[in-house]
Amino acid sequence: KLLNELCRTSVKNKNYFAKATFDQVDPSIPYSGIIKAMRFLLGQIILEGPDSLLLWQHKLNDALKTNAHMIIDVIPELDTILHQKKHANQTTPSPSTLTFNLHFQTFIDVFTTNHLPLVLVLDDLQWADIESLSVLDYLLTENKNILIIVAYRENEIHSNLPVFNFISTIIQKICSKTSRQ
């Protein structure tokens, strides 16, 4: 109920809202929760109409340049906005490569601006994959125009899960940043 109210408030304030739940069945799928959240966000943009689509098409093309196909391969809805045809010589690297990570982060950065911060809500963080946690770490440390809300079941967090170290690291970063201010 709280998340639905947050979504309503975000939409009323013209913020973009992306939400997703990580999957317990196969937590090893790279970027699973982040991809679901971005698909949710793109669904909102697609419903806004042709003027908005054109604006986002320009923003995304400017940011991604010739690398949009990497993102389209994992988020096909993006092609509804960009209308790019994949060239025969374009190949998509493994989603775990540094190149893909950088382009994926650039893609997310397009939606986070000073005047319109992105609200990202991720549930069941305990099932997050390493790649998603890497993107979250980047967003938390490098991007100032995003509100990230995560939920997890503390009783399901074990030291062998990737999220265990992630939460500890984020808490340390927050404490360090707070003590410097």
Language-model features: where?
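Key residue(s) within conserved catalytic/signature motifs
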Residues: K1-Q181
